[in-house]
Amino acid sequence: MKQGELVPVSEMARRLGVTRERVRQMILEGKLEGVRLGRYWYVREREGGRLRRVYTFFTHAGGAGKTSLARDLGFELARRGFRVLLVDTDPQANLTSWLGVREVAPEETLLHLVDTGQLPTPRRLSEWGLDLIPASLDLARVEVRLMQRPLSTLLLRTALRKTEGYDFVLIDSLPSLGHLAALGALAGDGLLVPVETSVKGVEALVGVMEAAQEYREALEQVDPRVPRSFVRLFIPTKFDARTLGDNRVLEKIAGLEDLAPVASPIAYRPGPHRRATERAVPLQLVGDRQAREEVERLTEEFLQRVVAQDAAREGVLEEVAE
């Protein structure tokens, strides 16, 4: 962009999940460029366009709900007017198929990135208001190629930094600690970690936290702005409030607040999730009010406790006052 676009106060506040009062404060502090036109104030976006955030859903434990969360959070953000790109890095391609995409050529996947250094052209999913870089079994070949090339796990991060036109990029990482998982994890501003409210879920956190620290240390060599905790949000999943065991595990997960925010739990709802998978639609569209409200609540917590905090920490809130 030559000169930043002028955006109304309410629109910028909505984009970042902050109040207009917070926007006014940023203008008064001189951190924003406010422009008055008649009775109304606008903010001029910085050169380079809209604020883009990249987050990776990550855990090496299968069955924690990582892929469905990526699908549903992405759809909810798109419904609110954000421009969203989903990236499927898992050769099992569950995110791809759960959004109704069946036939995928190798050059449409991240195999194209590893071969050429360029992102493939995303698929436009007009029905959901999303863009998707899909996956297929061909993506399994990437693991070996990444092992043979030094620093290749930063390819996706580098390519996404050059990509314009999105407010959010959400990456669905495969349940692994290998090179392909690292490609997805290192691409983001941080990790969104689903934690099943079970003994297995808590035990898996040890490996997740060790990997997160290693990723952070690696990124610190190329980007000094990496946050102290590379985990940006813990999301308790498959929670059954009726069981003593789940409630005890939830208490343990709540104790992680010193490391990163802990979202409200996502309940165990096998029926709605099965219908969403069978119909290849986001969870919000299967007619279960409680499931829809949980995703809406998670989205609010994500915007308030992760996105707004990250933007404030970096001092790049690009919003407006009225």
Swiss-Prot record:
Q: Which UniProt keywords apply?
A: ATP-binding, Chromosome partition, Nucleotide-binding, Plasmid
Among InterPro entries, the record links this protein to: AAA_dom, DNA_Partitioning_ATPase, P-loop_NTPase
According to its UniProt entry, one GO biological process term is: chromosome segregation
Residue positions annotated to bind ATP are H60, A61, G62, G63, A64, G65, K66, T67
**CDD domains, per database record:** ParAB_family
> Recorded GO terms, molecular function?
ATP binding
Q: Does the record carry ATP-binding as a key word?
A: yes
Q: Which SUPFAM superfamilies does the entry mention?
A: P-loop containing nucleoside triphosphate hydrolases
Name the Pfam families on file: AAA_31 (PF13614)
Highest taxon listed in the record's lineage = Bacteria
Give the protein's function. Probably involved in plasmid DNA partitioning.
Q: Which family does it belong to?
A: Belongs to the ParA family.
The protein, known as: Probable plasmid-partitioning protein ParA
Annotated source species = Thermus thermophilus (strain ATCC BAA-163 / DSM 7039 / HB27)
